[in-house]
């Protein structure tokens, strides 16, 4: 469910041009018990000038299923169900668009002018899905100027920072709901990781216009995953050491 109250304000947040202006709703997917990630997201959002009094900003209590069913893991199923419910609510509310963030999203330190150019142009162009954060690099593509959007038809992992426009929301909801009714391995798409489902949706609907931010404005934070479970995150003591290493890596390298 979506929490009714906006997130609390952070004292001393510097004024800045909001990166997220122009979206009807901004949702952060967060497991209630992952208070560490919520705190990190509060810092990240304040860094880009998000107004904590803005009623468009919501924290979504991520799903925690008790059975994984045909999904790769409990976390994968919970992630899928969370994104689907957020989109169902967006459809019911007849939103013009929605920006969805996962709670391991870190915003990059690109110049404010680049971020402003991307935001301004997004809302004056034609698009269905827009990935503000993605793993695709344009460093070796001289034709891609910083601050531009790039049409993309290829597949990639990650769904930590993406937007969906109004006309694509019903089609995406219908596609995802169909996946929940199919068996694993179904040729049209069965239970799978959510980012894989987005890839299949775009492959089966080539008219859907997907744009990637050039450059990517957000990457996934190095932290314990609730979706991809690692053996070292399950061992007491060792998991704390790994967490310290991740925190040190983030401090040193961002």
Predicted regions and their residues:
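An acidic/histidine-cluster motif and surrounding catalytic segment
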Residues: 1-101, 105-254
